[in-house]
Amino acid sequence: MRLVKTLPLLLSLSAALGSASAFALPTDRDQPIRIQADNAHLDDKQGVATYTGDVIITQGSMMIKGNTVTMTRAANGDIDVVTSVGNLAYFEQQQSTAKPEKMKGWAVTIQYQAQKDTVILTDRAKVENEGNTTEGEKIVYNTKTQVATAGRGGNVTQPRQRIDMVIQPKKKAE
């Protein structure tokens, strides 16, 4: 599976919070991918891999956790969709070598759609970066255009009428 090129994009959600650095560490994509799970079901014919039971996927500074992670491949063999489901599914990644703090995100479902360059966090979605937070039923982020939308979701366990954002003041240079 060609996960190396696409999973780091899943974690570039920091631009949704106004971060100056919307990219992951450049060395992350060159690191091996490690998948740990209680069970794995791989269907090469259908191009689907499903990992269940305390799933942890790491690549460089990036980590994804969920109860179930499903990866589907497109006809050309590239990763098409990665879906992490949990209570809550979680991801983190260091965004720059100059800033060791990791950007973090939680949701019942976190999905990366490679063909659309889109990350979707649904149901109890929350993203934290550099002290800033965004919470809502659904957060959608386009990794190519770096445009984020937060708002109402479809089937959610805890409906929210509004999004909630906290933006920290910029620190003045001394």
Residue ranges and their predicted role:
Residues 1-174:
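Mature-chain termini and adjacent capping regions
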